[in-house]
Curated annotation (Swiss-Prot):
Organism lineage string: Bacteria, Pseudomonadati, Chlorobiota, Chlorobiia, Chlorobiales
Protein name: 6,7-dimethyl-8-ribityllumazine synthase
UniProt keyword Phosphoprotein, yes or no: no
Record-linked InterPro entries: LS (IPR034964), LS/RS (IPR002180), LS/RS_sf (IPR036467)
Pfam families for the chain: DMRL_synthase (PF00885)
Binding site for (2S)-2-hydroxy-3-oxobutyl phosphate: 87-88, 129
């Protein structure tokens, strides 16, 4: 008897993606979008198969992601956004609810939903994670979405 191994490939060819991105802190969010698009194209995907959907803020990401998932148009969804800690508890509430909501949509979805929302202590950390010192987390989230979309197709 042989053990069967199933895993996804990193080939984005023929896959359709929705990038759901919050506009708040857009100068950083746009860098995440650029990283995600770069990843998909580098892995054989086509820019014509990518739809960028913008919503006001991170709190709206789960509902917009759910709507995109229910449309049946996409093989995977990449959520992107930036939540930076301020001097009030607002950060904790928004970060927790956005994360929980996106995770819930991911559990309901028949397609993969990857998480590329930055939750940082300050602006410098956000900039570092959007394409400078710490890589681009949009790229990383898209890479996970590619692998998961191919994995889902095998299950």
């Amino acid at each position: 008897m042989q053990v069967q191994n199933i895993e996804g490939s990193l080939n984005a060819s023929g896959l359709k993606f929705a990038l759901v991105v919050s506009r708040f802190n857009d100068f950083i969010g746009q860098k995440l979008v650029e990283g995600a698009i770069d990843c998909i194209v580098r892995h054989g995907g086509s820019a014509d198969e990518i739809t960028v959907i913008r919503c006001p803020g991170a709190f709206e990401l789960p509902s917009v992601t759910r709507k995109a998932m229910l449309s049946g148009k996409y093989d995977a969804i990449v959520t992107l956004g930036v939540i930076i800690r301020g001097s009030t508890p607002h950060f904790d509430v928004i970060a927790a609810e956005a994360t929980k909501g996106i995770a819930q949509v991911g559990m309901e979805a028949a397609i993969p939903v990857s998480f590329g929302v930055l939750t940082t202590e300050n602006l410098e950390q956000a900039i570092e994670r959007a394409g400078t010192k710490a890589g681009n987390k949009g790229f990383d989230a898209a890479l996970a979405a590619i692998e998961m979309a191919n994995l889902y197709k095998q299950l």
